[in-house]
From Swiss-Prot:
Protein's recorded name: UPF0312 protein Sputw3181_1309
Record-stated family: Belongs to the UPF0312 family. Type 1 subfamily.
PANTHER family recorded: PROTEIN YCEI
Naturally occurring in which organism (per UniProt): Shewanella sp. (strain W3-18-1)
A Pfam family: YceI
Keywords: Periplasm, Signal
GO cellular component, one term: periplasmic space
Keyword Signal in annotation: yes
């Protein structure tokens, strides 16, 4: 009797659909399928563009429940690269990133808003130059699926802008140069 009851319970449990849950992903920086690039207006005449070559992170994501998404990223600020060695040295210095004291920047999500059609707003806290402030990233879910190597991937793009002074960056190149624009491309491999 006990065996029949146990068998019946197992059988019923297999028929009940399992609830979808978020999958965990590691950001694919090894395969260069992710990037963090920046753009700053240079004196109102042009732009300085660059990137961070060394960062890592992870996220959890379920397309059926995008508001449950979480994101965590750590950036090695020493890896700043604007394609000009002297400028990079200045950016790493006390006028800007102050990497001697703060060699890392972090972003940790706090909430996600679903705007429909794959558009999201990822709210979180950015810690840069020893200062933590709220930051909203406008993001878009590009797609997800199996890769040719037997893994599963999900990808996103994102943009955000912040004022340098909000993060204790005191260098003043004028009002045209007061903000940083970040462009993000993230592809994650399911863990």
């Amino acid at each position: 009797m006990k065996k029949q009851l146990l068998s019946a319970l197992i059988g019923v449990s297999l028929l009940v659909p399992m609830a979808a849950s978020a999958a965990d992903y590691v950001i694919d920086t090894e395969g260069a399928h992710a990037s963090i690039t920046f753009k700053v207006n240079h004196l109102g005449y042009s732009y300085v563009v660059g990137r961070f070559n060394d960062f890592s992170g992870d996220f959890s994501y379920d397309a059926a429940k995008p508001t449950a998404m979480t994101v965590n990223v750590t950036v090695n600020t020493l890896s700043v690269d604007s394609n000009h060695a002297e400028r990079d040295k200045h950016i790493r210095g006390e006028d800007f990133l102050n990497t001697g004291k703060f060699a890392k920047a972090t972003f940790a999500s706090t909430s996600v808003e679903d705007k429909g059609n794959g558009d999201l707003v990822i709210n979180g806290n950015l810690t840069l130059n020893g200062v933590t402030k709220p930051l909203a990233i406008k993001a878009h879910a590009v797609g997800e699926g199996q890769d040719p190597w037997g893994g599963y991937r999900a990808g996103f793009t994102g943009t955000t802008t912040f004022a340098m002074k909000d993060f204790g960056i005191k260098m003043d190149l004028g009002p045209a140069s007061s903000h940083v624009e970040l462009d993000l491309v993230v592809e994650g491999v399911r863990k």
